[in-house]
């Protein structure tokens, strides 16, 4: 029997990971977001945001500079596809996602992105004020920042990965 600690290494028990504030702040200084497309009332990062009840997948994003930290479960591919398609309509979409380079959605959609920033180490997700015992836990997976700029799609893979560390987010 695999103990609970090992289970987390192979599969997370949750699919919503609250964006670390310093990561959002650093990206927001660079992009000036106008819409958080995957949010809840308690963790929205922008004044304008979509909750699960709003169903961001069914909304238009094309007039916005979008921040997206989607649910990390099986539906993530639909969110990455939506980000790509909305960029073709004029949206700029910055995605914080798990770096699952072995998945179909990664090869089909992420590789069409304008930029992929692979985060060194593991991000510490969540609101640190709400963590048990005042500590946050590192994610059981590596993360990436994927950027879809408003442009015409190409038929070839165009993303060139760069590397950033969580410490770099704290410097800005």
Predicted regions and their residues:
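Class I S-adenosyl-L-methionine-dependent methyltransferase catalytic core
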Residues: 1-172
């Amino acid at each position: 029997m695999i103990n609970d600690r090992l289970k987390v290494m192979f599969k997370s028990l949750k699919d919503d990971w609250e964006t670390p504030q310093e990561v959002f702040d650093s990206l927001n200084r660079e992009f000036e977001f106008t819409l958080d497309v995957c949010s809840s009332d308690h963790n929205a990062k922008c004044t304008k945001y979509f909750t699960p009840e709003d169903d961001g997948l069914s909304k238009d994003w094309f007039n916005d500079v979008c921040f997206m930290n989607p649910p990390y479960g099986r539906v993530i591919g639909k969110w990455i596809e939506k980000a790509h398609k909305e960029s073709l309509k004029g949206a700029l979409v910055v995605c914080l996602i798990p770096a699952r380079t072995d998945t179909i959605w990664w090869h089909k959609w992420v590789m069409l992105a304008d930029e992929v920033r692979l985060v060194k180490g593991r991000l510490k997700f969540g609101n640190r004020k709400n963590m048990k015992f005042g500590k946050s836990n590192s994610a059981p997976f590596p993360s990436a920042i994927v950027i879809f700029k408003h442009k015409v799609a190409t038929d070839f893979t165009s993303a060139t990965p760069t590397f950033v560390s969580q410490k770099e987010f704290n410097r800005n």
